[in-house]
Amino acid sequence: DLWQFGQMILKETGKLPFPYYTTYGCYCGWGGQGQPKDATDRCCFVHDCCYGKLTNCKPKTDRYSYSRENGVIICGEGTPCEKQICECDKAAAVCFRENLRTYKXXYMAYPDVLCKKPAEKC
């Protein structure tokens, strides 16, 4: 669920998901349109695509099982939906960590009106 995703982000990046990732660029947070602004925003675009490929799942509310071992997120047992949601969230949290050095504070609370270009396809 979104709370678990937030905890993954915090552990991976050391940053609070709100406000650092909830309104970043064109794809972090609710919805998304246009072209991703940078590598961090692309993490959100890919995460949105990952959620979009799930069928009959509720990624924002379905809880899943995971742990961290030696700093690595391990998705645990559960339904196929729970496992897939966990893998989507894990990939995004790791992506955020890998792109911390290019994170731009100017893309926080980025206005949607500036995300007008045609959206990329997943």
From Swiss-Prot:
Superkingdom of source: Eukaryota
Localization terms from the record: Secreted
Main location: secreted
Cofactor(s) named in the record: Ca(2+)
Tissue: Expressed by the venom gland.
Key words, A-Z: Blood coagulation cascade inhibiting toxin, Calcium, Disulfide bond, Hemostasis impairing toxin, Hydrolase, Lipid degradation, Lipid metabolism, Metal-binding, Secreted, Toxin
UniProt-annotated binding residues for Ca(2+): Y27, G29, G31, D48
GO molecular function terms listed in the Swiss-Prot or TrEMBL record: calcium ion binding; calcium-dependent phospholipase A2 activity; phospholipid binding; toxin activity
Other comments on record: Displays 20 times higher phospholipase activity than blK-PLA2.
Stated family: Belongs to the phospholipase A2 family. Group II subfamily. D49 sub-subfamily.
PANTHER family given in the database record: PHOSPHOLIPASE A2 FAMILY MEMBER, PHOSPHOLIPASE A2, MEMBRANE ASSOCIATED
Chain's role: Snake venom phospholipase A2 (PLA2) that does not inhibit platelet aggregation. Exhibits cytotoxic and anticoagulant activity. Induces Ehrlich tumor growth but not angiogenesis. PLA2 catalyzes the calcium-dependent hydrolysis of the 2-acyl groups in 3-sn-phosphoglycerides.
Protein name: Basic phospholipase A2
Organism the protein comes from: Bothrops leucurus
Lineage, opening ranks: Eukaryota, Metazoa, Chordata, Craniata, Vertebrata
